[in-house]
Amino acid sequence: MESAAGILEQFHIDVKTGKQLASELRKRLAGGEYRDIPYGDWLAKKVTADLRDIVHDDHLQLRFNYWLSTTESAAKQSEEEARQAVAAHCFFDKVEHLPPNIGYLKFNVFADRDACAKAAGEAMDALADSDALIIDLRDNRGGRGGMGELLASYLFAGRTHLADSFRRADNVTTESWTTPDVPGRKFLGKPVYVLISRNTFSAGEGFSFVLQAQKRATLVGETTVGGSGTIEFKPIDAHFTLVVPTGRVTSPANRKDFVGTGVVPDVKVPAAEALDVALRLAAQSRHGNRSGAGAKP
């Protein structure tokens, strides 16, 4: 646990929070709270609960692996996760046309970009002729940020600077940009609505936040939880890994982030009503487009 405390101090995106977490962890360790926990998975669950109780961040997690963790096993695990994603059609749960000609895309996980670029292209191409697009992230709990970049690339005509991620440990800022050339057709010059809720988390928040800041989408629903930005998996030993927030994501459009405050929707309604409200807005925008108006990327 001392190693975990050191990692939190060194790598947590917020210096004060990292020190607070490390101090509390050491205090509980010295007090013997973890001494009599017999199993690794029990210890991982206890420490995770303690960390989240201190700062209320669902990203924080101590993970336990029964099998020895090696670079080779980690690579095999990533390959297996990618295989499972492809088998599940990359978690694109619904790709539909709703009346009157409104595209509807629902997915609860941002899958691996390399493994799922083809599926993403097929989904976006299938919806390209819609008059408006609704992206449903009300139950999205995050995943791989690269998929968010890819999907956003379908909504902008040119190369667009989406976000900046600052990593405190080495004082490095990484830029995130759209990809000009993507498989399938883009969705340009037409309105986009993103549905969010209290359950929307992590990469789901980042994707919504970026599109809102770029004025490319109207957000409908509830304010999100406000999870931290980017995370890293820090090995403690052969069995334990600490998941720690190491980066803060900001928009180049307004230099803001959503940590702690959450992503605030443009149209605040209960999550259960968000789809119906977005459909009404989309129908209205459809009428406006035929009159010569409409959202532009």
Name each model feature, range by range:
Residues 66-70, 109-113, 139-145, 161, ...:
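Solvent-exposed loop/turn segments at secondary-structure junctions
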Residues 142-191, 229-235, 246-250:
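Gly/Ser/Thr-rich loop/hinge elements
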Residues 113-131:
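A short, well-ordered alpha-helical element
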Residues 15-100, 286-297:
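Extended, small/polar residue-biased N-terminal targeting/export presequences
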Residues 4, 51, 105, 135, ...:
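Terminal peptide-recognition signature
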Residues 105-109, 129-142, 195:
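Short acidic catalytic loops
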Residues 85, 89-117, 253-254:
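STAS-typified acidic loop motif
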Residues 259-297:
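Low-complexity, Gly/Ser/Thr/Pro-rich intrinsically disordered linker/tail segments
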